[in-house]
Amino acid sequence: MGTGKSSVGRLIADQLQFTFVDTDERIEERAGKSINRIFEQNGESAFREYERQIVDELGTLKRSVISTGGGLGASAENLASLKQHALVVCLWASPQIIWKRVRTQTHRPLLQGDDPKTKIRELLAVREPFYRQADVLVNTEVRSAKEVAQHVMHEFQLARQR
């Protein structure tokens, strides 16, 4: 959430001439409604079930850059599945920076409550142990999307050499 996953992912996919996959977009296509609407009508558990289904399908993709929602990697099962088939990269930013980036966005159902700043801190506290299990962890606070993409590309090239 607010770390640049989609922007950076698209840049990397373009550079590598890979397919770009956004799991949130796939979920919306499958559900036939927006993520906000899924949360409103069916709840977070239904959304997480869609995520699980999509992750199960991702293992068959080749030459793809996959951007996941911030909560997808906070599931041990999803993270293990992704790590079997891919280099898992976590883009990171502090709660303050994330808030600065997302505060005007209305499509983030987990931030619709009275105190979204606190919610961001709480979400990151729960998710951080999972995020730290990524193969590559990149702080995006002071880097442009292009700089982050270059860093991830370098890590990808190193991983391919192993």
What spans do the regions from the language model cover?
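ATP-binding Walker
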Residues: 3
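Walker A/P-loop
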Residues: 6
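NTP-dependent small-molecule kinase module
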Residues: 11, 15, 61, 125-162
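ATP-dependent small-molecule kinase phosphotransfer cores
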Residues: 22-83, 107-108, 130
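Short glycine-rich anion-binding loops that position phosphate/pyrophosphate groups of nucleotides
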Residues: 70-72, 94-96, 143-144
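A glycine- and Lys/Arg-enriched "phosphate-lid" helix/loop adjacent to the NTP-binding pocket
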Residues: 84-128
